[in-house]
């Protein structure tokens, strides 16, 4: 009797500990996004230091005249819209709606790809105006910050593709739903970073 009570008494704390134990996927995602946040914080710092130096020698303002703000706003709206469609996909995954998940993630992939292509077109236009990564301090700051962000967008698009391929090849499982949510966290993060870059580069200048 005592043994049974003792075992029950030991089992209860173990169950509580199991319930309170952090999900390793969540912890890993938080750690990864924290590292990414520090990386982009460094890029923002680099941009503002370059901006201060450029303003000091008078070479910064004339470079920003090449920016097409309405065009940048358009591709920004496209990227932000992809965050909305991504979240719709997550809602579908939580309901076990595989068709909805596929549909919304596919739309997200298309919108993300349009953003990358749009940014590539902007690069071509700016290079045509003589603005390159080697042409000036501003050119270096612009292409480095936006270029690294574009690489993160491409990585996000590829992650969506991987999720869809895994869903297509096997039965939909809770693990796949979790993977979809983790990818969405990364995508929302990339979108928020771009909003910060857009405000900094195209409005504050």
Swiss-Prot record:
Belongs to the cytochrome c oxidase subunit 3 family. One of its GO terms (biological process) is aerobic electron transport chain. GO terms for cellular component: plasma membrane. CDD domains: Heme_Cu_Oxidase_III_like. The chain crosses the membrane at residues 29-49, 72-92, 104-124, 142-162, 184-204. SUPFAM superfamilies: Cytochrome c oxidase subunit III-like. This is Cytochrome c oxidase subunit 3. It catalyses: 4 Fe(II)-[cytochrome c] + O2 + 8 H(+)(in) = 4 Fe(III)-[cytochrome c] + 2 H2O + 4 H(+)(out). GO terms for molecular function: cytochrome-c oxidase activity. It comes from Corynebacterium glutamicum (strain ATCC 13032 / DSM 20300 / JCM 1318 / BCRC 11384 / CCUG 27702 / LMG 3730 / NBRC 12168 / NCIMB 10025 / NRRL B-2784 / 534). Its EC number is 7.1.1.9. It is a multi-pass membrane protein. It is an enzyme of class 7 (translocase). Keywords: Cell membrane, Membrane, Translocase, Transmembrane, Transmembrane helix. It holds the Pfam family COX3. Its main location: membrane.
